[in-house]
Amino acid sequence: MEGKATELLAVLKNNNLAIDVKVSHLLSIKSDIKQKNVPDNAVHLIFESLRLAITSHHAALYAAGFSTFGHFLKRLFIQDQAHIVSAYARHFCPVLLERLGDHKERVRAQAAQIFTDLWPAASADVEHYVLEVALTGKNPKAKETSLIWLSNMSRNHGLLFRSYVPSVVSCLEDADSFVRHTAKSTVVELFQGAPARAKADLTKEMTAQNVRQSIVNAVYANIGLEDHSSTARPRSRVEPRYTPCTDSHPLRSASRAEVVHQQPAAVVSSAPLRPSKEATPMVEPEPIKSRPGSSKSDKGRTIAAAPEAEKAPHMETARPSSQDGEAPQPLHAETSKQVEDLFRVLSPAFEGRESEDNWRHREKYITSLRRLTYGNAPHDFPQPFFTGIKTNLDGIFKAVNSLRTTLSTNGCLLIQDLAKIGGSRIDPMVEVIMQNLIKLCGGMKKISAQNGNVSVNDVLANVTYTPRLLQHVTSACQDKNAQLRLFAAGWLKTLLNKQSHHKSSLEHGGGLALLEKSLKRGLTDANPGIREAMRGAFWTFHQMWPARGNNILSDLDNKTRHLLEKDPANPNRDQSSYLSSDTLTVPSRSALKEAIAAHKKARLAPAKTLPPRPESAQSSFSETKVSDPPAKSTGRTARAPLSSLSSAPMRPGAKPRRPELARPATADPYSSRKTAATDAVHIDSSPRPRRVANLGQAPSSTKSKPKKLDIPMTMAVDPVAPSASNENETQVATQVASKVRKRSSLSEQFAAIKRDDRDINALSELSINKTEHPHEIAVGESSNNEAGRHDDHAPCEISFDKLDRHDENKLSESPTPGPDHHDENALGELSINVPDRRDETALGELSINKPQRRDENALGELSINKLDRRDENTPSKSPPSEQDRRVEKTIDSAEHTSQAQRRVEESEPYFARFKIRSRLSNKRRNISPHSEHLENAKEMVRVAGQRIRSRSFDLFAYRKLQDLIHYHGEKLFTRPVFDDLLDGLLVELRKEPSPDRKHNGDYADVKTQVVGTLRLLEKSCPNLFVIDYDAIDAIFHARRYFETNSWIVQELQQTALEWFRNCEPSKLEGMLDTLVQYVQRETRDEPGYRSILMALSLLTDLIGDANKKGAWFSNEILEQVGTIAARDILAEDTDIRKKSIELCVQLYVMSTNLYQDKGVSFWRLVKAPEGGTRQLIMYYIARQ
């Protein structure tokens, strides 16, 4: 046989021989195989010969090859040489696979039979090529044959088919009708006698792959599931009743693949069986070709498949959907491998660009991912699920950014579902999600942008907060795209609501500064829609940080603030203006409109019936003479009175006469004007009771004052509880400052409200005082015109910054004669403004024509510790002479103060400008009798340092400590006690402010009291207080916690500057070296830049002072300063760069004066920067 095998191989390789010769040699060796054993040396030759025969293109030759191959395999199994079959199977399977897809059915059947013969010896290779390659391939003939082979092997050889069910089910939706028909027959055969669990798996698989309902119903009917949907359409002609594929098959005769091949029992029992797979892919592989007409029914299949999916016993009910009105049917996974298989199957569909061929598959896979998200995968198999999501995130956003609306919407819904269900588990991918969604929100397509907006809201509301999220939102708030800014207002509110119970996460890392910047820009945006949307976010911010909200509110203009306060989101808005129309009015909106129209008609009707009036009589009546009843005045908006830019009163415009205002025609037409124009000198003798009500209504025509601003209407020294006596004294001083400073817009409003709220009693009280002092009346009359100019400009504030000890010395050295011409002018101003005071006691006791003594402090009684007095609620009992001295000293101090010193920054709160300096200049401290004893005071001070370190020291305790220091001075301390107190103050100054202490006062006030106490110790205890390096470091460290626009920053800068200027020359070099080292080691972040900015400002001032005096610092200090300037001139912060330029200018002047080398040493000090930086420095030096 070896010789025949060798001859056969040579014949088959010879292309010159006829086919009949080759066939005859092949049949000859076939006869020998059937009758004799095959020797081992001939096995290889026969396998190679059969391979050449089967691959031949001649039908006679490959038919003889298939026939010979079958007998050859039987002989090898009989000889117990299955291992040889297994070894050669892997080489023969590719050849057989090609024949499995042949266009001739007979050839396909022969190839299938050879696979059946090979299976007992090489089951793994055979199943791989037939059921994993051919069944999922592109050749419909190979698919059809593979399905028939699977049915045969399952029925006759016990092949476990569970792992191949997804591939079979995918063939139910194949583009080829023969494949679909064969797949239905195969499914029916496989599951006809299957257990209930297997049928449930089949139901789930068909639902997962969206098999059309007609096919599903046909399968259910044939496998014994009687509860299939009755709504399916009738069976068509192309869908006959299905019978097993071995019984009948249309359009072809039975093939050899359907012949039952009986193997010997020993061979079958010894054949290795392949274990079944547990994992079942839930999505079919990408089809080759879409079935015609199936695209329009994709959604219909999903909806129709839902009732069938509900039959599965383990299926959960669907959750409510986020936006599309109906949640997708949950898809449950049995194992983690199923989840991995799903992501492996869908990945190829998202490769490359979107096209007409792949967009439907992308949409289907996105829907499958949504169903999987609503299933058990995120909870039972989170690791493979979220890993797969992260891996395919790029493909998901290809769907999100698609131009097809349905695909983009489904992608956004998937992101929303992931955010809601995944929560913090999608944190690793939230950066990519935010970048893509924000880009989507800025697009021109409204539907996609709105979907992106909702998706961003869901992501922000469910993922873990990070500062990067806030940066994304605030960046969108400042974007050029108006639509993005509009959406960002809602995102900001969502973020604030989510973090409302975790404010510290926003407060750290500069989050509050970003929030304030975004809110300010949004509230003043040019787009009204953005302003309206940002108001809701502002009031959410205001509820979390009231003090910062008030700062933002105070910086807005009147119109913006008015609209902001009237916003429905304002929890503290005044409901009085809405009481009549919203709360007390029960009828509907239409009834309200009718009532308003009727009221207007009633108002205008009498004007038509009025007879003509002579010109000598008044033709209209001023509205100031009458006032409507309170119920009416609160229910309608006050009409804006006619006015001009001048504050002088003018005749109101003509208005129709009302029936209830009829009066004699001989009435004085100028009476109202007299009342309105009456000054502090002229008082109408005829009282008008209704005038009081009208004065109370006057403010309704102006802008309503801000409700949350911590700026009082009177000059209360302590913002917590101003006393009556303080109000009287500070109001007198306020009038003196009316010519000194420029009032702010808020002061105008409060002054107008104060002025209009005065009643006639103040004028009556003034007439009594004038009777007692006739010479005062003359002075008042001489200044009548001036009063007309300044009456409306009475300021609400006065600066005490410059009333320091220098002014006190000037006042104490001045002579004390009677009133002269200078006093008359001051008294004239006071007498003009006296009627604006409401307190009768203050006016009764004020005697300004008896100045006798000027040796006391002008601000002696103006202490911010008035709150500690026991008689704070009673009128002042001081003798008239003492009040005279205070008034005269205030006038003299105000007039002797230079104009530059009188200027006050309007952006600061009203009490911040004199809180510290007024205490330093105040010599008269009222302390309790217990504290007047030195031993008792020492005991109090001894524990002060420890209490400050433990943060149990409130604002009132600081003020009490300052009173003790001022009263007792250095006698209060020993060196250990003083050092302990100083250490406690410096520790508190370095500590980061804690928001939980705000109920005791704003933490800026605490730091302010610490700074004030330090400056008081410096002035009161000069022998104990030493300005050392720790104090400088602490005051610069405190600067890190406050924004540049905070008023405490000025106090910190002024304190540090005074310490350096008052430092001994021997220690100045060391302190400058400490300052420079502090700047070098400070971190270059937002808090660090604040300290650096203050240090650079201080260095600039100190070098500037030295330049004016012609002095200079050592070369080492100048080199360090040059290093700092060169480093920070390119800093990220704009203020730092600006201040570095100023420092370079001063350093250039000092180096030029020191070295006399025309700037050569300066460029050496700043490390000789090149390019634009050098030109910039040279420009500012030249401009200087």
Swiss-Prot record:
GO BP term (any one): mitotic spindle assembly
HEAT repeats by residue range: 92-130, 162-194, 463-499
UniProt keyword Metal-binding present: no
UniProt-recorded Gene Ontology molecular function terms: microtubule binding
Keyword terms, alphabetized: Cell cycle, Cell division, Cytoplasm, Cytoskeleton, Microtubule, Mitosis, Nucleus, Repeat
Subcellular location(s) of the protein: Cytoplasm, Cytoskeleton; Nucleus; Cytoplasm, Cytoskeleton, Spindle
Family per record: Belongs to the CLASP family.
Protein task: Microtubule binding protein that promotes the stabilization of dynamic microtubules. Required for mitotic spindle formation.
Protein's recorded name: Protein stu1
Organism annotation: Aspergillus oryzae (strain ATCC 42149 / RIB 40)
